[in-house]
Amino acid sequence: MYVVAITGGIGSGKTTIANQFAELGIDVVDADVIAREVVEPGAPALAAIAAHFGPDVIAADGQLDRRSLRERVFSDPDAKVWLNALLHPLIRQEMFGRCAAAHSPYCLLVVPLLVENKLTGLANRVLVIDVDEATQIERTCRRDGVSREQVQAILAAQASRAERLAAADDVLDNKNGAPETIKPRILALHETYMAFASQQASQV
């Protein structure tokens, strides 16, 4: 399966762009969705997290209390290492499986922290959704109802714009964000990826 990874910083519009590829019939695998699924009630990973951190990280309804876990991990680097060692292999395995099971000519793999977690090798091609920092801050504040300072803290913890662009095979400028502006570029990329996927399939 030919895999195109799509990444970008917070507020860049990754989900919106991925949805437009989905409308073209392309299977989309989202790392964030998988990350939530592997810690659902009944999942072995959730039991391991509860055993390691204690019952405080489990909410009354049996779901993972993400805020409580975030606070524990934020203040304890060793805890973050342990958690990543547990979850990242599970998420990666599930991403591989879903990409392999895709039925479209190529698969779109949405990984927000592709560069940060050094996962560019998972894909045949990397598409970076690029916007400037001011746009990221404005969109995220409006979408999530958070302060500029909170968004800036998230940005500081993510790869820089330059680091993401250095990892890109293709770049989609999404500063405007208007569908009519983006659609022609998406269609052009789609045709390119279809051709690459066809070429790969013919070599198998």
UniProtKB/Swiss-Prot annotation:
ATP binds at residues 11-16. Pathway: Cofactor biosynthesis; coenzyme A biosynthesis; CoA from (R)-pantothenate: step 5/5. It is an enzyme of class 2 (transferase). Keywords: ATP-binding, Coenzyme A biosynthesis, Cytoplasm, Kinase, Nucleotide-binding, Transferase. It comes from the Bacteria. Its EC number is 2.7.1.24. GO terms for biological process: coenzyme A biosynthetic process. GO terms for cellular component: cytoplasm. It is found in: Cytoplasm. Residues 3-200 form the DPCK domain. One of its GO terms (molecular function) is dephospho-CoA kinase activity. CDD domains: DPCK. SUPFAM superfamilies: P-loop containing nucleoside triphosphate hydrolases. The keyword Disulfide bond does not apply. It catalyses: 3'-dephospho-CoA + ATP = ADP + CoA + H(+). Catalyzes the phosphorylation of the 3'-hydroxyl group of dephosphocoenzyme A to form coenzyme A. PANTHER family: BIFUNCTIONAL COENZYME A SYNTHASE-RELATED, DEPHOSPHO-COA KINASE-RELATED. Belongs to the CoaE family. This is Dephospho-CoA kinase.
